[in-house]
Amino acid sequence: GFAGLVTARHLVKAGVVEKLCDVTVIDAAAAHVYTPWLYEAATGALRGETGATKSKMIKMASFTYATLPGFKGVRFVQKRIEGVDLVAKQVVVEGKRLIPYDVLVVSLGAEPNYFGVPGLPENALVLKRLDDAQKIHDAIVRLLDKASARQPKYILIAGAGPNGVEFVSELANTIRILERRERIQSGIIKITLADPNPELFTILAPSLRKRAVRRLEKLGVELRPGLRVAEVGQGYVKAFTGTGKHNDAVRLPADLCIWSAGVKVNTLATSLSVLKDDRGRIVLENSYMVASHPGVFAAGDCASLINPHTGKPDPQSAQVAHYQTHDLSKNIIRYIKGQPLKAAHLPKRWAFFSALGGACAAGTLGGVKFWGYPAFLLRRISDLYYFLYLLPLVPALKTWLEGVRLYHKNDC
């Protein structure tokens, strides 16, 4: 996860790796995925770009551990974790191999939550991993090839959270550009954004919320707030509108359904014998240490740390995860040295920016609202902010600039 990898990077920068401690990062995948770029990867290269450009757009959103700069002395183990023995202080990976630890950082992240909806796992795609972006991209290409005025194709995105909004906005913008350039007929791709909440974009300030609605409508997206998915089949979605006993069933065409309506804590994290909150997240002390388990820390989507300014845990996001690593890494060093741990420093409010297709975005920073191109620039700068956490200066700048250059093709 974001938190685990960036914590390892902080320990390298602190000069303690191979001196004060040995650091091992365990992941089933061979690469770290930068999920805020996945929507770009999934919607990129739909305009006739070469196969090499398409491949680069998708791979740009990941970093192979074996070639990751700035992690000297860190050992990467590509194995699936099967369990954690908190008593024996061992991580069990595939093949029943045991990896002992003195300090453990649990950063297992989250996984899609299908809420028991029939047909959803089998008939919908999600956007969490690199291969998900590839599958969605290929599915869109197939629809573009088959769509016609007589047989339009329907794409339904279920879930108007940040990921769903950024994806649907970029997709709709791309479709409009293809129409303007007469690469496809106008109106042959129909895009719907559905969400169970009666109002969309509630994470934005009310004034920005209204502008975001107008922006998506201008891009041709049909907005369906208050729509709860009840079943997903091949070519359709059944849903309910309204609440309580007055639900009305509707059946919507969906040649492609993208599920972005919620995540849950990683299954392995929920299996740990530790205190959890009502959403299954690991309850932490204010030092990021797991309650009643000295030497075990957690961060990111699987962790529940109360923000003293709000009285509740912070949202599950990449931004929160890598921010937490500042104090987490320092407390790991303090723990190893036998020093008292310090409480986490958390902001009163989080900066938030959501891309809305092309060079347009919306968000807030320090209570100030931003819209349009200024917000889009700040959204791009937030990517650089993360890369500066993860990588040395020159590789961070090169990665960011290459991503900006490459994904700019999506915006014009």
Regions found by a protein language model. Give the residues of each.
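Beta1-alpha1 glycine-rich phosphate/pyrophosphate-binding loop at the start
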Residues: 1-75, 165-203, 258
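C-terminal auxiliary extensions adjacent to catalytic cores
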Residues: 358-412
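FAD-binding core/adjacent interface of flavoenzyme oxidoreductases
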Residues: 74-154, 243-247, 258
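FAD-site-proximal beta/loop scaffold in flavoenzymes
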Residues: 122-148, 251-323
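Internal hydrophobic alpha-helix adjacent to the cofactor/substrate pocket in enzyme cavities
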Residues: 8, 173-176, 319-347
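A Rossmann-like FAD-binding core segment of flavoenzymes
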Residues: 20-22, 72-83, 173-286, 292, ...
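Rossmann-like NAD(P)H-binding beta-loop-alpha module
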Residues: 136-187
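Active-site-proximal substrate-binding core of FAD-dependent oxidoreductases
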Residues: 146-148, 192, 309-314, 331-370
